[in-house]
């Protein structure tokens, strides 16, 4: 028989009031008190202080791209375009980050992969700032506002894997069809709701005005730890 499990413990948020509001939104039970709690955080003309590392969560790729490019243009210094190395069969729709990653000193970036080394210095969704670019050595130095140690970032390789069943040996085997190599980073002044799934941010600006699907706003709000 099928076993049903219900996950009840919330790890992302710890504030009981915030958890209650999120649950009421999910269950379509939002009351006036919940609305007042949400509206208390609405600031139409809000502009974050420089280096506060807010990230804007929005509904469309074009809006996230526009914000990222506008913020990148505000930075002085040379723009560096880093091309990914794609080998064999790796479909463009499956690229984990931009094929051409555009960076500048001071750019706000987000890691898109967990650190698999022993030190675990970064994780998927961690936000930092580009401090040095040494592309001749294929290195980017990223610093963090939380005081954690700077990280020298190198290219990572993703594999396009096909799984097949080996009947003779009764086991599943992997076949690597192609690879994608790029720095595990993306510009992070803004990101879409879709790409923020599973991530947690300490500071976020929620752009709810262009949400078009049921549950999008609640999904945005749940990205924020509190």
Where are these regions (language model features)?
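C-terminal accessory regions
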Residues: 110-148, 152-226
């Amino acid at each position: 028989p099928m076993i049903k499990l219900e996950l009840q413990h919330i790890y992302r948020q710890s504030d009981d009031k915030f958890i209650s509001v999120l649950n009421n939104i999910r269950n379509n039970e939002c009351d006036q008190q919940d609305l007042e709690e949400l509206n208390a955080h609405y600031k139409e003309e809000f502009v974050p202080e420089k280096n506060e590392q807010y990230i804007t969560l929005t509904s469309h790729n074009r809006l996230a791209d526009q914000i990222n490019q506008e913020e990148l243009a505000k930075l002085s210094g040379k723009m560096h375009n880093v091309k990914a190395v794609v080998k064999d069969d790796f479909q463009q729709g499956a690229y984990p980050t931009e094929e051409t990653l555009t960076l500048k000193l001071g750019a706000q970036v987000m890691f898109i992969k967990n650190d698999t080394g022993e030190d675990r210095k970064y994780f998927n969704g961690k936000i930092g700032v580009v401090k040095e670019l040494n592309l001749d050595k294929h290195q980017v130095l990223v610093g963090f506002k939380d005081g954690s140690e700077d990280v020298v970032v190198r290219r990572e390789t993703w594999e396009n894997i096909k799984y097949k069943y080996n009947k003779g040996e009764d086991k599943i085997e992997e076949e690597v069809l192609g690879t994608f190599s790029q720095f595990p980073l993306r510009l992070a002044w803004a990101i879409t709701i879709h790409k923020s799934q599973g991530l947690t941010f300490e500071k976020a600006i929620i752009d709810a005005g262009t949400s078009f699907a049921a549950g999008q706003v609640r999904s945005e709000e749940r990205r924020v730890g509190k």
